[in-house]
Amino acid sequence: MTGTPPLCAAPDPDPRAPAFDVPAGACDCHFHIFDGPSPQVAERSYTALPAPLPAFRHLQRTLGLTRSVIVQPSVYGTDNRTTLQTCAADPAIKAVVVIDEDTPPDVLASCREQGAVGCRVNMLFGSNAQIDSLAGLAGRIADHGWHLQILGDVSALHDRMDAFAGFPVPVVFDHFGHLEAAKGVNDPGFTALLRLLGDGHAWVKLSGAYRLGPAGPDTDAAVADLAAALIAANPDQLVWGSDWPHPAIPQQEMPNDGAVLDALAGWVPDTALRHRILVRNPARLYGFDDDA
């Protein structure tokens, strides 16, 4: 990569409250912090602006969320210090870290002790991670009770998706499976994801909808169709995430996080089902006490 990777836009500093009653114990299952000891790696696809924990806390209070899952961003590589520092002192925050084949067992154990419950694999942006090699990684993290989180376009993985069914850990797909929404519910990769989800071999995050196509009603309608198909397949293995501070989203497309949460209510008008997606399912996947 030559030159400085493009600078990210800042998130909306004035999130509005959602238009529905958010249940107690609701969890944001996908956010990032850009602030702390971890340097941004040279080979990265964007340059993050500071996005500190106090700003996220303000967002949480405004949206009525009390639990959260911080996800290691690609720009920090395998330096998980900022991510772990965020969650180490707060049992209401869990972490998803990034490791590689050289990460020793004692580091994995240390990450777990600091609140890590899973690891993320980036299969986008030129990553050479392959499904065959992920089976070995899944075996390494199984002893720690972790899940494997996939950032990858399921439409590009369609002929290998069934391999995930044999993994010894839960497999979680970011951002609806990160396919272009216009490809629709009949895309072979998405139908493979639905099959995994329906059989209980996968989880899906209803997050990052604005990453799936150009802003506008056509993308909104296509995303709603994807959401409906996922809900029909298995609502008990769906979770929601804000994706705050929305890295690499242009300023003119930067969403207000109240609208991001309201989108969930549009996809899931049933109150009891929203409670499962916001409270019960995250408690089961990430190990929160399900007392809400």
What is each residue range found by the language model?
Residues 2-25, 49-67, 235-237, 251-292:
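Mid-to-C-terminal alpha-helical segments outside catalytic/metal-binding sites
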Residues 2-11, 75-162, 205-217:
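Active-site gating/metal-coordination segments in enzymes
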Residues 3-5, 131-240:
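Catalytic pocket-lining loop regions of alpha/beta-barrel enzymes
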Residues 27-31, 68-71, 94-97, 117-121, ...:
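Hydrophobic faces of well-ordered beta-strands that scaffold small-molecule active sites
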Residues 30, 60, 83, 119, ...:
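Conserved, mostly hydrophobic/aromatic
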Residues 41-89:
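Alpha-helical scaffold segments that flank or form the walls of functional sites
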Residues 80-96, 223-231, 254-266:
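Short, electropositive alpha-helical surface patch
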